[in-house]
Amino acid sequence: MDPQLPEPEPLVSLIEALRRLPGVGVRSARRMAYHLMQHDLQGADMLGRALAGAVQNLRHCARCNSFTEDDICATCANPKRDPSVLCVVETPADQNMIEASHGYRGLYYVLMGRVAPLEGIGPRELDFQRLLERASDGVVREVILATNFTAEGETTAHFLGEVLAGKGLKVTRLARGVPAGSELEYVDAGTIAWALMERKSA
């Protein structure tokens, strides 16, 4: 319910900005905004500066498409990683969960999304051509499709599997230990490690 009293425009703008966060409705956004303005002005200032710094200084890695301050991220530049295996994930959060499993030492490619026809998101919007060029560099031998086990994630994996296999690459999919309909961000590290070990041909 909207408040009976009119709110100052800067406060309304802050509430609307906070509502853009996933899972945050108008009530939660209003509660956050009032908390920051009433109890934590220092935190509000830190949040504003951190957001501005991230927007200004972060870019996409030229190789894996994840976030970095440099042209090439630290993971892609690490000589101890296995460049012959490429793991494709939807988001940087999914990449972090796979890394936390300690079961993978290859490289990554982050799609920054998934195929969702009803939302107008297809291969062109996700720049699949860039992934195909990355996977066809002559070094990659296996591509692990680690998209989420949702309808959109499965559609994405199916499409990529067909195209990548047509390039002569070995294409595998995480094992079904990851529950159907789940997102990797919320799956425990042990389950992800098992799913990586038991991965199957896509």
Swiss-Prot record:
Q: Which residues form the signal peptide?
A: none
Key word tRNA processing present: no
Q: What is this protein called?
A: Recombination protein RecR
Job of this protein: May play a role in DNA repair. It seems to be involved in an RecBC-independent recombinational process of DNA repair. It may act with RecF and RecO.
Gene designation per UniProt: recR
Alphabetized GO MF terms: DNA binding; zinc ion binding
Residue ranges occupied by any Toprim domain in the UniProt entry: 84-179
Q: According to the UniProt record, which cysteines are disulfide-bonded?
A: none
* Entry keyword set: DNA damage, DNA recombination, DNA repair, Metal-binding, Zinc, Zinc-finger
- Does the keyword section mention Transferase? no
Q: Which source organism does the UniProt entry give?
A: Bordetella petrii (strain ATCC BAA-461 / DSM 12804 / CCUG 43448)
